[in-house]
Curated annotation (Swiss-Prot):
The lineage of its organism: Eukaryota, Viridiplantae, Streptophyta, Embryophyta, Bryophyta. It is found in: Plastid, Chloroplast. It comes from the Eukaryota. The basic functional RuBisCO is composed of a large chain homodimer in a 'head-to-tail' conformation. In form I RuBisCO this homodimer is arranged in a barrel-like tetramer with the small subunits forming a tetrameric 'cap' on each end of the 'barrel'. Belongs to the RuBisCO small chain family. Keywords: Calvin cycle, Carbon dioxide fixation, Chloroplast, Photorespiration, Photosynthesis, Plastid. GO terms for cellular component: chloroplast. Its main location: plastid. RuBisCO catalyzes two reactions: the carboxylation of D-ribulose 1,5-bisphosphate, the primary event in carbon dioxide fixation, as well as the oxidative fragmentation of the pentose substrate. Both reactions occur simultaneously and in competition at the same active site. Although the small subunit is not catalytic it is essential for maximal activity. This is Ribulose bisphosphate carboxylase small subunit, chloroplastic. GO terms for biological process: photorespiration; reductive pentose-phosphate cycle. Heterohexadecamer of 8 large and 8 small subunits.
Amino acid sequence: XQVWNPIGQPKFETF
């Protein structure tokens, strides 16, 4: 899924 870091950078994770 797509999650966002606290600093606001887009981070793509596969669950």
